[in-house]
Amino acid sequence: MHFTRKLSLAVILSTVAAAVSAADIKVSSLDELQTAINSATPGAHIIVVDGVYDATNPIVISQKGTAHKPVVISAENIGGAEISGAIGFLLKSNAAYVTIEGFKFTHATGIEEHGGGEMIGAGASHCRYTRNIFELSGKSRGYYLMISGDDTEIDHNSFQNKFTIGQMIIIHGPSTNLMAQRTWIHQNIFTNFPDAHGNNCSSIQIGVSGRSLSPAHALVENNLFIRCRGENENICNKSCDNIYRFNTFEDNCSELSLRHGDRNIVYANFFLGTDGLRMFGKNDKIFSNYFEDCHRGIHIGNGDGVVPASKLTSHDRPDGMQIAFNTIVNCTNSVMMLARRNGLGATNIIFKNNIVAGGKNLVAIEGAMTHSVVKNNLFWGNTNGVGEYASGFIFEDPKLKRDANGEFHLQKRSPAINHASGGFSYVKVDMDDQKRGWWKKDIGADEFSTKIPKNRILTVAEVGPFAP
């Protein structure tokens, strides 16, 4: 389904060796830092002593490490070395296997044509930002981190306290129609991004309209989003072949929006008190997700064009979406499509094996769903909006019970157990990251089990710079 990344023993040993190497270089000024970077060779470890460093020019990195001997540039202590001023690190096209670790960034945000922000340029590869604190300043607009290079890893960082227009993370690529490849974003916390009253204010944006038909193969997993609503799209997907899994969205976050692009996969995420998930494009797979107390649960977009015949900026009519094995509990609008003037609706949608329970409007479809299948969904609560889709629901109590961690799970004798309709061979795990059977799966996001779940609602202690 996607690539898997694991640290080999050799990489772990080489990292430990680098930490105690006699080649470690301590610096205490930006001039010393730039000089040390310019002469860095594979395995170099440059340590910036604690303090505040006011940068007026970019800290330029063009050096190459190797997979086993990365060039590591780290703060003496996490958050102890602060980069303030006009600009931060600029990883240029030659940079490879470079790690930036433990800094606090409070310098100016980035505007693409003018520089600023943290930047991994096109041509850079296998670069990593880990255990940093991003709290960049900016009076008007700008991004925190821009990525155009391939095989970037962004992990265990805090992206926090953004109050201006611009994304926290924006991913571009090497040209106007190609995407950076295989970005891996994991174990980060994104928090406190209130409404910036403008567009392009997502926590993460992967692509832009002009690149939206290009594959990016990004993996966004195990991140925690709290109070992120810079705009209506908390995550804005504008490219193809990306995966979003094992993330937690809570406390008034805006939506995960599949705004452009095809063949994206969203599974085993927790949406708690948010605007849920919205989708446009073709052949996305949405499964094993958990929605509770959301203003919107699953929002099927009402298209106004059909890409590629229509403009890439259009709302591409949803086509071939598979929405299966999700659990939606106590949401204001559980499953919806908003009306649109001259809207094209959606087509070839499969909505099967979901649980919809409680809430105000369980189904509110205000547009066409041609050639679509709504079947074998468990439905419990009022019947607002069900209408023509009533035959696709089984009206029976799914017997859900909240566990000690706060999630609703199936109980014994639930009518969901072993009653999913066939197919969906790609649905291999449930919301707990526990295996589903090949044949008799359970309806909804949870596969009944007495085992301890592997995937749970994330807490602040499990993500960010100070997490294990």
Where are these regions (language model features)?
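Glycine- and acidic/polar-rich repeat regions and solenoidal domains
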Residues: 56-64, 76, 81-92, 106-128, ...
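Bacterial N-terminal signal peptides that target proteins for export
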Residues: 1-11
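Surface beta-loop-beta hairpin patches that serve as ligand-binding interfaces in beta-rich domains
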Residues: 414-468
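Beta-solenoid repeat scaffold
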Residues: 41-82, 91-101
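Short catalytic/signature loops enriched in Gly
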Residues: 399-422
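Acidic Gly/Asp/Thr-rich repetitive segments characteristic of extracellular carbohydrate-active
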Residues: 22-61, 88, 414, 432, ...
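Cleavable N-terminal signal peptides
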Residues: 10, 20-21
